[in-house]
Amino acid sequence: MDFILGGVAACGACFFTNPLEVVKTRMQLQGELKSRGTYQVYYRNVFHAFYTIGKIDGLAGLQKGLVPGLVYQFFMNGVRLGSYALTESLGYIHTDGRVSATKSTVSGAIAGVVGAVMGSPIYLVKTHLQSQSTSSIAVGHQYKHRGMTNALFAIHKQHGILGLWRGASAAIPRVSVGSAAQLATFSASKEMVNDLQVFSEGSWLIALSAGMISSVVVVLAMTPFDVVSTRLYNQPVDHLGKGMLYRGFVDCFSKTLKKEGMTGLYKGLGASYFRLGPHTILSLLFWNELRCLHQSYS
């Protein structure tokens, strides 16, 4: 049941934050491997990106990739949050009745790796669909998929089953780092807020406060990995399915750092927080409340 609750909670958050994911993806691909001032800026900031996409691609453009986004969140976070909840219920993340920073971080990272591997094909398709736009504001390589199913069949037909896991080398560090940061800080923050007795015991405000603290840590830790992941998933490939811009995670990381500097790895930081912040807060809040609701009826 923990796996289903985790998936449902993440889907609830995804429905509200998907437009922010579209904006984040576009901003991370803008000026790829180009020095500042040498490329046309279509999206000046988060708000300008919202306006531009809404104006040129239409309001539906802001919800591009929603279907694969929901599928990805259900399976990836279902496995990730469900695995973590299982280790938590077995008492593994606690030492002497208190949350262990080391154990909760390791548990979060392992849960993230499992979720990332399972969800990688859907994340690949989601990235392709969210980067697709009208030519006048296009950034990154433009695939011409007609939808999630069409994309999965097209990739499988051209590059085989392994082609669906292209980019997984970036997804694993991305999700493991993000998961470790998110779940460890959420567990510790929830315990801290409880100790301060700011809210009544069992209040949903405890989970909300812990989620807000966790969201800041997640964005700072995850953004460089998120930029690399987006670029690896979206890069054009040759007839053998090999990337034409990057050989893998380390190559993409080093090329981005060399060409665009440290700011390149934090491209779209504002968009990342606007997306990952609310998503982290909402998914953790929904997850916590659904678990409490399930426990009260079981």
Curated annotation (Swiss-Prot):
Belongs to the mitochondrial carrier (TC 2.A.29) family. The keyword Transport applies. The chain crosses the membrane at residues 38-58, 59-79, 91-118, 168-189, 204-224, 276-296. The gene is slc25a35. The keyword Hydrolase does not apply. Keywords: Membrane, Mitochondrion, Mitochondrion inner membrane, Repeat, Transmembrane, Transmembrane helix, Transport. GO terms for cellular component: mitochondrial inner membrane. InterPro entries: Mito_Carrier_Antiporter, Mitochondrial_sb/sol_carrier, Mt_carrier_dom_sf. Pfam families: Mito_carr. Solcar repeats lie at residues 1-90, 99-192, 202-293. It is found in: Mitochondrion inner membrane. Disulfide bonds: none annotated. It comes from Danio rerio (Zebrafish). This is Solute carrier family 25 member 35. It is a multi-pass membrane protein.
